[in-house]
């Protein structure tokens, strides 16, 4: 499922609410949460909520005169789609060139290298 960058900001608010057991959220609550992060008008946020509804990324339930929004798309599923798309677009679906790119541009710190070594050892040991 394709979620735009702006839509992902709205999704983050809904995922955070879900993780902290505050979901579902009304549109006003989403607007209030985003007022601290973005300089968006209420109409923009409601448009983004409607787009996410049409895509099936969120669901809405009626609560009196308002709607409450809950994520359907999990953050983990979105992250997997996004990372696989990035990997495919930029590195022909291969992880090694991605790591090499960051290594060449000095974006890997000692902690990153240690974590990568540990992951490789786990793969060698047959662990997922």
Give residue spans per PLM region.
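Glycine-centered, phosphate/nucleic-acid-interacting loop/turn motifs that mediate DNA/RNA or nucleotide
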Residues: 56
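Short, cationic-aromatic polyanion-contact patches
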Residues: 4-6, 63-82
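Short beta-strand "wing" residues that participate in macromolecule-binding interfaces
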Residues: 60
């Amino acid at each position: 499922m394709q979620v735009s960058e702006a839509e992902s900001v709205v999704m983050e608010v809904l995922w955070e609410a879900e993780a902290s057991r505050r979901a579902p959220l009304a549109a006003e609550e989403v607007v209030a949460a985003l007022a601290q992060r973005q300089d968006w008008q209420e109409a923009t946020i409601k448009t983004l909520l409607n787009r996410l509804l049409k895509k099936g990324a969120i669901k809405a339930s009626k609560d009196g005169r308002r709607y409450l929004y809950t994520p359907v798309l999990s953050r983990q599923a979105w992250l997997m789609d996004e990372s696989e798309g990035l990997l495919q677009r930029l590195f022909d679906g291969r992880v090694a060139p991605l790591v090499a790119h960051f290594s060449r541009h000095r974006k890997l710190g000692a902690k990153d290298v240690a974590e990568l070594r540990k992951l490789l050892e786990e793969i060698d040991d047959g662990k997922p």
